[in-house]
């Protein structure tokens, strides 16, 4: 953790992981909360080519529009094997905007190169305070994938009111 600066409307936190998460990759993340707006800036730097996935777990189905095709989401993590019914679409301009429930999302590859967006229904999210009080809710995975030596993703998430 580099910094944590809370304020009356939220605050800003910043962290760096240099070579410890993935050999040869420096990861930097800065998140800011300003009332109902959440801004996430995620960067990766390397001397080698990588496949980078920016992953969101959503409790509401994303409203992404047309043009998605059946796909297979492959990755190094065994968690990818649990995600079924995957759809994908390439966004040549590197920007995807959508809603999920009452929340609005704008995710940009700030290098303005294409991104591939995958989404699928994922295993349900379980929550509760005890074994007898456990509930599940539907869960959706959204993965923004890009390839290259470096990654720079900027997300703006505007939280809507609960229904």
What is each of the regions a protein language model found here?
Residues 1-163:
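CBM-like, beta-strand-rich accessory domains located in the C-terminal region of large
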């Amino acid at each position: 953790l580099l910094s944590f600066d809370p304020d009356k409307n939220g605050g800003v936190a910043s962290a760096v992981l240099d070579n410890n998460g993935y050999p040869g990759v420096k990861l930097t993340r800065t998140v800011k909360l300003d009332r109902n707006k959440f801004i996430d800036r995620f960067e990766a730097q390397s001397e080698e080519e990588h496949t980078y996935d920016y992953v969101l777990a959503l409790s509401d189905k994303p409203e992404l529009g047309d043009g998605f095709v059946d796909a297979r989401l492959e990755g190094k993590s065994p968690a990818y094997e649990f995600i079924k019914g995957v759809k994908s679409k390439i966004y040549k301009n590197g920007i995807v905007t959508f809603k999920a429930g009452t929340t609005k999302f704008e995710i940009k590859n700030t290098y303005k190169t294409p991104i591939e967006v995958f989404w699928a229904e994922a295993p349900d999210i379980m929550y509760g305070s005890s074994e007898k009080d456990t509930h599940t809710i539907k869960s959706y995975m959204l993965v923004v994938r890009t390839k290259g030596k470096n990654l720079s993703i900027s997300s703006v998430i505007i939280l809507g009111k609960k229904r």
